[in-house]
Amino acid sequence: MSDQNQPEQNHLYLVDGSGYIFRAYHQLPPLTNRHGVPAGAVYGYTAMLWKLAKDLHEADGPTHMAVILDKSGTTFRNDLYEHYKANRPPPPEDLVPQFPLIREATRAFSLPCIEEQGFEADDIIASYTMAAVARGWQVTIVS
């Protein structure tokens, strides 16, 4: 017999926060806050996260949820192949100061903001997915 207050199965939602950030950045015109700090990606990111949270709440959403971000720097893939993403440009200058604000906004949603030096968000998402599935959890990746 199951407890009425407990879900039948844990359901983990993993949000590709890096994907959200870049989509928000390229989707909106440049915006700044009253101090002149770029804020367009922050606005777009939080709007998308708010909509996701609202939709999930209305649908009796996940039992667990986390936002996964890329951490700047090299990854283990660079050690395996020195030219890995060698042609990829750095993030736009006006996006860089928004990263800490986006982390802060994520925490304001009471969501963990997970990032690990040496690993891309995709690698972390894959690891969390494998661990959750091994425990019998359902996993949804939001990208």
Language-model features: locations:
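Noncatalytic, basic helical substrate-engagement surface that gates or grips nucleic-acid strands
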Residues: S2-V142
